[in-house]
Amino acid sequence: MTISAPPIIDIRQAGLESSIPDQVVEGLTKEVKTLPALLFYSTKGIQHWNRHSHAADFYPRHEELCILKAEASKMAASIAQDSLVIDMGSASMDKVILLLEALEEQKKSITYYALDLSYSELASNFQAIPVDRFHYVRFAALHGTFDDGLHWLQNAPDIRNRPRCILLFGLTIGNFSRDNAASFLRNIAQSALSTSPTQSSIIVSLDSCKLPTKILRAYTADGVVPFALASLSYANSLFHPKGDRKIFNEEDWYFHSEWNHALGRHEASLITQSKDIQLGAPLETVIVRRDEKIRFGCSYKYDKAERDQLFHSAGLEDAAVWTAPDCDVAFYQLRLRLN
């Protein structure tokens, strides 16, 4: 019997790649220069990130795996029958498969949707799933952004009344500023949890580590430099599809990593190797000084007070916590605060 591949549903509302150049121009013409996160998640960028996240020193992934191996059955027990399980940024499947296997073992009839920006990565990840081993868990994929996924959840008529479990693994919420993280969680709660609030939840991983040596080892581990530099070649291809010109010469740039103690976050930037750099068209008026950073990513760490503030600001409460000894990472099940 031939098992058909899970469907990949295109839920993109607008031309994503056409909006990235506008974000690049906006970020590089500000006083404090930045690059948009979407620039780093091309197909090649995702492949480099997966390599980086598998490095021995990249503790967040290893700690998530450790917790899931021990606690997946308890997590699965907390997910309602007939739920939609939406993985917001699926990337590598090696973590979530532990939860899906636990759901299958408990005979939970659920539909798992992997959401990702890269069609080819979705197709590749699903090829690696032994779908013939699953009888209760059904698989599908959503090709689009976070916003596309939330819009789909609100508007697809055939799923409107089913319980939802939103997965935010991989410390995804740490990539947002603290205020934006609360807004993002609040938006998910209002979009995805309100139709069945007592049976729906968000499962999110957060990191409480604020030890600079451990953090800097993790975020400079193997694979991170090509991940960072792949964004520049992707930008060149978006602005100049024919390949006849460049905004960035990749060999002019370094990856820079630092811990910001005051803000409780790791900061990732690109810096010039040794000199001032004039960018190419259409940004030829932009000069990046040799001591200037172009920030592209932050990873916020959360102590207990910061977690409590995050959940409260988002209108959520933690219903369960799963962690393991010696782990700074933990998973939190969040539900709408009803009082």
Curated annotation (Swiss-Prot):
Keyword Transferase in record: yes
Residues passing through the membrane, by range: none
Pathway: Alkaloid biosynthesis; ergot alkaloid biosynthesis
GO MF annotation list: methyltransferase activity; protein homodimerization activity
Practical use: Ergot alkaloids are known for their toxic effects on humans who consume contaminated grains or livestock that graze on grasses harboring ergot alkaloid-producing fungi. Due to their strong affinity for monoamine neurotransmitter receptors they may also have clinical uses such as treatment of migraines, Parkinson's disease and cerebrovascular insufficiency.
Induction (record text): The expression of the ergot alkaloid synthesis cluster which leads to the synthesis of fumigaclavines is positively regulated by the brlA and stuA transcription factors.
EC primary class: transferase
GO biological process: ergot alkaloid biosynthetic process; fumigaclavine C biosynthetic process; methylation
Catalytic activity: 4-(3-methylbut-2-enyl)-L-tryptophan + S-adenosyl-L-methionine = 4-(3-methylbut-2-enyl)-L-abrine + S-adenosyl-L-homocysteine + H(+)
Superkingdom of source: Eukaryota
InterPro entries recorded: EgtD_Methyltrsf_superfamily (IPR051128), MeTrfase_dom (IPR019257), MeTrfase_EgtD-like (IPR017804), SAM-dependent_MTases_sf (IPR029063), SAM_MeTrfase_EasF-type_put (IPR017805)
Keyword annotations: Alkaloid metabolism, Methyltransferase, S-adenosyl-L-methionine, Transferase
Signal peptide: none
Record-listed E.C. numbers: 2.1.1.261
Coiled-coil ranges from the UniProt annotation: none
Known partners and oligomeric status: Homodimer.
UniProt xrefs under PANTHER family: ERGOTHIONEINE BIOSYNTHESIS PROTEIN 1
Its biological purpose: 4-dimethylallyltryptophan N-methyltransferase; part of the gene cluster that mediates the biosynthesis of fumiclavanine C, a fungal ergot alkaloid. DmaW catalyzes the first step of ergot alkaloid biosynthesis by condensing dimethylallyl diphosphate (DMAP) and tryptophan to form 4-dimethylallyl-L-tryptophan. The second step is catalyzed by the methyltransferase easF that methylates 4-dimethylallyl-L-tryptophan in the presence of S-adenosyl-L-methionine, resulting in the formation of 4-dimethylallyl-L-abrine.
Family classification: Belongs to the methyltransferase superfamily.
Stored NCBIfam families: methyl_EasF
Protein name stated in the entry: 4-dimethylallyltryptophan N-methyltransferase easF
